[in-house]
Structures are given as structure tokens and as C-alpha cells.
């Protein structure tokens, strides 16, 4: 039996465990990336391990989230990250150089390599043939120190692409079509691998758009083959020596196969408030819109923005629409400026933003009250835009641009013939905003710069034999990490300060939660299906940890968040019988008698509702390793004990 692309990379990097679905496996990590909203905590964690210099082939820290410097906090954090990078062997991408995933694809990604990043959209690297996985900051810190990264061996899904996209239909429409089929939880425990003749018709940036939004499927990662198209992209980036051919064996076996005929696809939109709430644009056509935002790590490549510039050239943005455009990298921005495309955008009435995440994370450009905003981004969770009742639709750059001109939802196919936008034979290469680390000889003299906003990792303690705690919060299905730990311009600057940021934990769902949890001292959260979907932010585990949350009892978890809870020493419990969710109310006193002994011996955990007298059976699905992490009180304590 042959291997899939992902299985080949896993086999090459396997350091422990067997490649059997459901088994815990450890992987050697070649590259890491961080962004600044999660990076400060990752580097605080790395420092705590006491390892002088990173042991990866390449580690890069990007500044792309907290670029709105309305106070000292962000600038201080950036100085801290830059000094840590200088001292410990990490490359530093300065603010303005671009969004981490776009820049990493351009300048550092290598086919066949493993990459983990403290950002859930790290699978963007799958567009170039990497096994690229989003992870919590502590997992990234451990990998930088030379430790293995552990995952549950996933199932393999093949998405077989046939045909060719019609004019005005884009890669964004492909991944929206996949989301329509699989849903936001259909990829959990799976790697999505793209193959078929249709793959050859897609450029590397188009492939990266698709793997980027594999995160919205809940997938471990997504990956494309590395082929002649990959070689041409790397050659144009001056990195042809990084090319390696990578494809699935003809006799590779997949657990699931999805067929998509590219010729049959049409322009699509993900409607509020979920990326899998997908409808054809033709069903929305004519509805008035208020705002259009083009950019993000999903759709900010040179190819995307050249297509946008072509649509906007000689036109005017509708009076009722605000159009904002953020190029994904300095490389893209500079090339658009030199070839005149940037001028066409500005002349049409676009507001040009810096090369950063910006509106995608609620960092500026929030729409008006109940405003309808078309965005080329990857998430449209309620409130994520910064406007609580904003109506966010996820669309392609082509749909976004033509709708901005007309002021209403518009199918781009109404424009007629589409211009052929070619990939450049050579990209503009200027890495002067990537700062190299100090040499081994110089690193001891580098001083770490810490601002007053930077606080220590929250205190943890080993698992006790029994837990008795109140239910401090009860929430429903599809709770996102944006619900747990909101982002935006006011809260993101606090990411280095767990005590302060904890004051905002779950306030989207219940404004009283932080104070209630703090008063209780220790508590348990109860939730529904797919709890913790979305961003990889470990702050969604660290803030509850700081507030005394000992366990989270839900119907099911999203992958990264469950891992982050384990890393923080918080028990991730699931109902054996989902109907038992109704047996717990806010304020009920819950007891986990003998939980330490139960965890040590297997998955079964007993939960007694002392308020009602009900006994509830729960599962705590852990490997031998994660069981030891929970008992130790979290990954940091476990790592110290075993180093």
C-alpha cells in the first residue's frame, strides 16, 4: 500500500508512535512561526525552558497583528520579541513586512518540511507542499527547543479536483465549496489532501488560499502536491534550490474521497455567521452593501490584488460603500506600487491599509451598526469584526471588487470576459525588513527588553485527587476562541498580560463571567458541540486557567483548543451521553471524585451534580503522554519535570 503526501512527510519526520489512525505520534519540526498576538507568550514560555538557542532549521517571528499602536503595550511587546529573536536564533519580520503566512509562503516555505505556527492559519504552507499545522504557543516553544510536536494520527481525505475554473470563479470559491460539503467540524481529526488534474490549473497562491481555509474545516492541516507549478513559484522567488517534488503514490489509500469539478463551480459567499453557511452569489445579488475589505492571509497575494486592480481600473467605488485593501506583504505592496496597480486602486476610491492582518482580527475597519460587509477573509464569526451586529460575508476578491463598484452584491461573471493575469516570472525580492539573529558568539551580550505590560505565565499546580467546583458558565454549540478570548484593538494589546486580559474572558457571552469565576476561585465550564473552534490562541485556555477553571465539560472539542487546554492543565471532558448536557445548570455544584485515579487508569471520569444528585459519565480522551501532562499540571511543568 502506498502513501499519501501527508503520510510521506509524517513518515520522514516521525520520532515516536505508530502511523495508525487515532494513535499519538510525535513529529520532528523543521520550521516554526509566531505572530505577535500569540508570540509574546510563546517566547516567555521558551525562556522558561532555559534553552539558549532554537534547534529548528528556521524559526521566524512576524509582527502583523498588533500594528495599531494606540498605547505603549504593542511597541513594548514588539521590542521584547525582537530582542528575544536576536538572542535566541530566531529571524524577526518587522511590522510592515507583511502577514506571517503570506511572507512565509514567499520567502521561507519549503516542500516536504514540517512547520508549526502559533496561528491557526499556518496550514497556508500546505499550498507549497509543507505539512503546516496551527498550534498553541507552548507547543511552538517546545518545538523551538528541539522537542517533538504531538498530534493524533489523522485520517486522510482526498479532494479530487477535475476540470478548470470558469472565468471569474476563484480559489476562494473552491474552498467555500469544500466547506459547504464538509462543514466547520467535518475536518476534525483529518488531513485534507488535494489531487487530480485540476490541481495543475492552480497557482501556488491559489492553492495556499485553499489550504489556509482548511482551518475552517477543523482539519489538522491541508496539503497540495509539490510539482512544476511549485518549482516555478520558488524560482520566481529566487529559491529554486528549495524545490522538492512531492506527490501521493498511485496506490495511496484515503479514508474519504470528495469529488469537485472546478468547471461546475460558481461564485459563492459564506453568509453570517459561519464559514460553512455558503450560498451562491446569484442568490444574494442586488442586496445593498456597506463595506468591502480585501486582504488577509487568505486573499492578499499579488495575483489576487492584480485581479482586483484590473476590476477597479477606471471605475469608482459606490457612494454607499467603504472599500479597504491591505496587501499581504511588502513584496506585493511594492510590486503593485511599481506597476501602477496601486494607483488604479487609489483612483477608484480604495483606502489602502498597511500589510498586516488589520480588519480580519477586528483591528480597525469595523463596519457600521448592522452593516453588511463583504470580506475576502476566512472567518465571519459574530462580533469578530468589532461590530457586535455586523453582517459579515466571506467572498472572493473578484466578487468583493465588483460589488464595491456597484454598491450591491454582484456576480463578477456579469463583467463579461476576464483578463488573463499572469504570475510574474520574477518577484521583487527585498528582505531588508527581516532581521537576522545574533551569532552564537554575540548572543550572550544581547539584552532582553521587557515592558511593564509583560507578565509571567499563570501559576499551575498538579492535578488533585478530587475536584469540587461550581459551574461558572454554560454555553451552546460552536463556541469559538473569539467568544472565549475576544480580539480587537482594545483587547489584543493585553495578550502579554494574562491577569489583565482575563477580565475580558467570555464577556461576549456573559459579561459577569470573569468576576464570577474569580469570586468562586475554582469552577467548571459546560458547553456544546465543537467547543473552541477557530483561532489557535492559547489565551483562550490561559485566561480560564488564571480565573480558576479546572475542567471544561462539553459535547465535543475543536482540535487546537483541546490541546491548549491540556497544555494549561485544564481537564478536557466530553459527555458520554450528549443529553446529559441538560442535567447541569449555571451555579450547580459539581464534583469529580477520585478524578486523578480515574485519569491515570483510563478515559472514564465520573461527574456528580451535588445540586441535583445526578451522576454524569464523561470521557477524558488522552494519550499516555497527555495524561502525564494533565497530572503534572500542564505542559510547562511536565517539560521541566522531564528535561
Where are these regions (language model features)?
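Fe-S-dependent hydro-lyases/dehydratases of central metabolism
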Residues: 1-643
